[in-house]
Swiss-Prot record:
Protein name (database record): Protein IRON-RELATED TRANSCRIPTION FACTOR 2
Species annotation: Oryza sativa subsp. japonica
Localization terms from the record: Nucleus; Cytoplasm
Residue ranges of the motif Nuclear localization signal: 68-75
Annotated tissue distribution: Expressed constitutively at low levels in the roots. Also observed in flowers, developing seeds, embryos and vascular bundles.
UniProt family annotation: Belongs to the bHLH protein family.
Record keywords: Activator, Cytoplasm, DNA-binding, Ethylene signaling pathway, Iron, Nucleus, Stress response, Transcription, Transcription regulation
Domain bHLH stretches: 68-119
Region (Basic motif): 68-81
Induction: Strongly induced in both roots and shoots during iron (Fe) deficiency stress. Ethylene enhances the iron deficiency-mediated induction. Induced by arsenate (AsV25 and AsV50); this induction is repressed by nitric oxide (NO). Accumulates under cadmium (Cd) stress; this induction is inhibited by the DNA methyltransferase inhibitor 5-aza-2-deoxycytidine (Aza).
Amino acid sequence: MEQLFVDDPAFASSMSSLEADIFSGAGQLPSSPWLDLDLDDDVQDLSMAPTTANAVSSGYGSGGSGSHRKLSHNAYERDRRKQLNELYSSLRALLPDADHTKLSIPTTVSRVLKYIPELQKQVENLERKKKELTTTSTTNCKPGVLGSQLMSEGMAPIVSATCINDMEIMVQVSLLSNVAGSVLPLSKCIKVLENEGLHFISSSTSSGFGNRTFYSIHLQRSEGTINEECPAFCERLEKVVRNKAKL
């Protein structure tokens, strides 16, 4: 058939030279600019594109997660320090009034460790005094005979002085309520102790069993420290208070 068209003069005259070359097979088809494309590589590149985008997105996500963890850690650390400061403030409030000033944490812990044994000793003394009170006869005082029976059994005040530290002393006084009101009121008891070189800090009064009144007086040495003389000094305070109750 190809030969038929080529041999026909009319058909041959109507074709251009390029067309003649194509139909005659003498020439080659013009090369296409797309014939050299590797479609497999293009498909692979397109399939990898989402993976790359996901990797980039994952990178940004990882960075955001790290920043969130850092903020959470900082917030947790702030809360932890706030709780610790509140605990140390509560611990500092348990110290005597003279130590309620702003103290460093090591100083607070040191004073508390020293103060706890002193409180334990004070509790032991109070328990001992309580036992003495429970075994003491508490007969009622009759009018007109208060002075003669004041130092008799059950009538004499029970006094206990305890050193809190080198400067402070706690004095507890237990006596019959009618004696407290007429012979040794709290104001007179404080005055007696101040005459011994002590500075009044605080006090409390309570009523207990056996129609007795209890004084708890917190004092501080005005000058110097108590140190080793504490037992003798406390004994002297106890004697002074008892003697004052005789008046």
